[in-house]
Amino acid sequence: MDKTIPIEFANSVDLAIIAFYFVSVIGIGLYFSKYIKGAGDYFRAGNKMHWWVAAISSWMSGFGAFVFTGLAGMIYLEGLQAALLTTTGLPAMIFAYFFFAKYWRRSRVMSILEYFGIRFNKVSLQISTWFYIPIYVLIMSAGLYSLSFFVGTALHFPVETVILVAGISIAIYTVIGGIWGVVITDTVQFLVLLPVSILMIPLSIHAVGGMDALVAQAPSGFWRPFSGEIPNAMVTIPFFLAYMLQIIHGQNTNPIAQRFFSVRNEREAQ
């Protein structure tokens, strides 16, 4: 039976809520700008950040519209083996707890690039800086595009328009509010996203006819990861291991490491 759910585009109330959200995040950046008295406040919050705020921000920094679009699509096509990609943050956090967190906090630098300059030399600092710039332009562009594609589809707006509005809003609260503007905005997003995501679980299961229907209608190999039953699967064991290494690296270097620099002591970094 075809259970396709028709798409209902946003109405005026939805648009008003979204507009309020954009105004709010810009307001957060403006509000926390008053706490910035120097570079230490701007880049590492003057080492006054509470661990739980830093933790939420770290998690949210790796969470975007891709989870609801690209990753959800991969799980739909490839089953549990694609869903296991979401577990790769666990080894990253284990490495952070036992090694990276306390040593990054102990370094007392404002960025990893600054650490390169202190630990090695200015040449290392310059090379690393110019190496990071194009990489993070691509990473941020991909994240902004996935966000804009998702929002543009829901609002029935051109993707280019959403990219422009979202990009400018993000730039404003980031540049004005510094690390405080970023982490508080991340925390607000978390408080909005968590209940909605939890609510989506029973609604999604109900939409497919219950758990029994979900299990019964899944294609062969959907619940058996890496069994070879999924044709042309992208998520293979080598892919999974490479992805896990990338997450371990990404969660313990720029820009996530800024949270380690910003908390009050090594214990809170852990």
Annotate each PLM feature.
Residues K3-P6, M74-Y76, F100-R105, S146-T153, ...:
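Membrane-water interface regions at transmembrane-helix termini and the short interhelical loops
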Residues F20, T88, V165-A166, I184-V188:
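Hydrophobic core positions of alpha-helical segments in small-molecule transporters
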Residues F9-S33, A45, V53, G73-V109, ...:
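Extracellular loop-to-transmembrane helix junctions
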Residues T4-L15, G40, R44-N47, G79, ...:
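Membrane-water interface of alpha-helical transmembrane segments
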Residues D2-F68, T174-G177, F190, V196-L203:
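Membrane-interface "cap" regions at the ends of multi-pass membrane proteins
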Residues I28-M49, K102-E114, V123-S124, I256-Q270:
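Membrane-helix boundary/linker segments in multi-pass transporters
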Residues D2-A10, N47-M49, V53, G70-L84, ...:
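Loop-to-helix junctions at membrane interfaces in multi-pass transport proteins
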Residues M60, A83-G177, L241-H249:
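Helix-loop-helix module between adjacent transmembrane segments
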